[in-house]
């Protein structure tokens, strides 16, 4: 067999289920054929994903419950004072799910109730699939480029992974918010970036942590404008829904996670993980504060490491550090909130540090965790999502995403100490030996793309 091209080795985790390893042609030829079939694979995957989710919804009814809440939240505006009073009851689990978003989000969700719910659900999940593809493409631009066919293959697999697949099944808005935050970090226009972060934070508070990214890269105007836009969304809510806005800020906002099953294995935050280990909700006690302080220190060191190679800063990885910290620090980080793993894997396999020792292994670990849906497997041993106490081995296994996230940050610190690359590829791709796409040039969006992603994933 001909020698395996390095990029094929980097992509093996992605194509292991699609390409036989014992055929006569070289691995590179197999990968080329796979790439040629990318549109068909992508189309088939999307059809199966949409059909399976819609079929589950039609048969069981236990799907799109987050989307149900968005629709009901928008419709509640027709009955003033009911936005934070209603509950959607899950038909299978009999859980009562309230509307937990700011009033501004309900205003944006208002048009959703004007269509039949089945049609809304179909269009919503198609849009989510499109957002996953756009996320992959934008992540490729961060690392220097990449072909549309590779993006199709990534998307075809990603929509079946736990975070994106779970988001599609429940109709979560998180993928849309991730795409908006990614573009905010990619854009060099302060008003575009600030507008996107302010609006997304107005819809769901968690994207507000991205302000730390803009402060860290000294984009002061963007950080300030994002705060102005956020408060503008609060003002819009107050003008249109004064009672609901007064009720949400600061009351319901400060109660985030208070009535939620924080000890469920689906909650992959430090609060959830530590609660399962000790057998009760740790709340905001010393144990949680200690874990967050240690993680914050590790995140700061990882941030510094990402700016230490050649004096340049890896923008995508720096953004990922902030988002990873935000996930583990949140009171509740359901598995479908971890959609940021998709750009993380793209960075590990195709980014400027891809030749660093451990990058491919770490990417494969994340890939395996996402495909195996470890929390889903562990949930089968969970009698109720409200039961916190569980056997020690299940409690420790339930730290899986948290441990992988902290390990990723630690790896960034260790890898950042190496200014050279063991295979001599310091000038082999975008960001290696030169600024890693620190500021994109105008017009590069329309630059011809590399047909062969095996060369630095499309250098510019």
Which stretches of residues belong to each language-model region?
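Transmembrane helices and adjacent periplasmic/lumenal helix-loop junctions
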Residues: 197-214, 330-340
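Hydrophobic/basic alpha-helical segments enriched in Actinobacteria
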Residues: 138-147, 187, 203, 220, ...
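Primarily membrane-embedded glycan-assembly and transfer machineries that use lipid-linked glycans
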Residues: 15-193, 217-335, 388, 393-397, ...
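Intrinsically disordered, low-complexity polar segments enriched in Ser/Thr/Pro and acidic
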Residues: 3-7, 178, 185, 430, ...
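Alpha-helical transmembrane segments in multipass membrane proteins, preferentially the mid-helix core
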Residues: 301-302, 339-352
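Acidic, Ala/Val/Gly-enriched low-complexity intrinsically disordered segments
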Residues: 2-4, 8, 16-19, 437, ...
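Aromatic-enriched
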Residues: 53, 349-440, 449-452, 457-460
């Amino acid at each position: 067999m001909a020698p395996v091209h390095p990029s094929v080795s980097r992509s093996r985790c992605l194509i292991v289920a699609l390409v036989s390893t014992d055929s006569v042609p070289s691995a590179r030829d197999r990968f080329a054929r796979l790439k040629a079939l990318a549109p068909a694979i992508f189309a088939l995957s999307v059809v199966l994903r949409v059909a399976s989710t819609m079929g589950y919804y039609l048969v069981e009814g236990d799907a799109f419950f987050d989307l149900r809440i968005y629709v009901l939240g928008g419709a509640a505006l027709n009955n003033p004072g009911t936005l934070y009073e209603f509950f959607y009851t899950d038909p299978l689990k009999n859980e009562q799910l309230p509307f937990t978003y700011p009033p501004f989000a309900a205003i944006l969700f208002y048009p959703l109730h004007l269509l039949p719910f089945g049609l809304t659900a179909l269009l919503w999940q198609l849009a989510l699939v499109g957002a996953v593809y756009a996320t992959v493409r934008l992540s490729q631009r961060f690392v220097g480029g990449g072909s549309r066919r590779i993006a199709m293959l990534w998307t075809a697999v990603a929509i079946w992974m736990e975070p994106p697949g779970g988001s599609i099944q429940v109709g979560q808005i998180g993928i849309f918010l991730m795409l908006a935050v990614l573009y905010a970090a990619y854009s060099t226009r302060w008003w575009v970036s600030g507008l996107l972060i302010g609006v997304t934070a107005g819809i769901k508070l968690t994207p507000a942590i991205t302000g730390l990214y803009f402060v860290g890269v000294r984009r002061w105007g963007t950080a300030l404008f994002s705060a102005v836009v956020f408060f503008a969304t609060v003002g819009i809510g107050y003008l249109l829904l004064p009672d609901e806005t007064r009720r949400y800020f600061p009351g319901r906002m400060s109660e985030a996670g208070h009535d939620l099953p924080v000890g469920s294995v689906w909650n992959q935050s430090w609060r959830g993980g530590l609660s399962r280990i000790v057998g009760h909700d740790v709340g905001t006690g010393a144990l949680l504060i200690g874990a967050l302080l240690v993680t914050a220190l590790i995140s700061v060191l990882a941030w510094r490491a990402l700016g230490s190679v050649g004096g340049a800063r890896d923008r995508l990885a720096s953004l990922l550090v902030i988002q990873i910290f935000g996930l583990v620090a949140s009171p509740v980080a359901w598995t479908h909130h971890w959609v940021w793993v998709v750009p993380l894997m793209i960075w590990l396999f195709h980014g400027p540090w891809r030749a660093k020792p451990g990058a491919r292994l770490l990417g494969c670990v994340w890939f395996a965790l996402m495909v195996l849906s470890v929390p889903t497997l562990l949930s089968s041993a969970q009698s109720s999502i409200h039961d916190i106490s569980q056997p020690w081995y299940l409690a420790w296994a339930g730290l899986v995403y948290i441990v992988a996230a902290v390990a990723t940050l630690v790896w960034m610190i260790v890898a950042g100490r190496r200014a050279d690359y063991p295979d001599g590829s310091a000038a082999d791709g975008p960001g290696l030996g030169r600024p890693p796409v620190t500021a994109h040039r105008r017009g590069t969006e329309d630059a011809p793309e590399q047909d062969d992603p095996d060369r630095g994933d499309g250098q510019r």
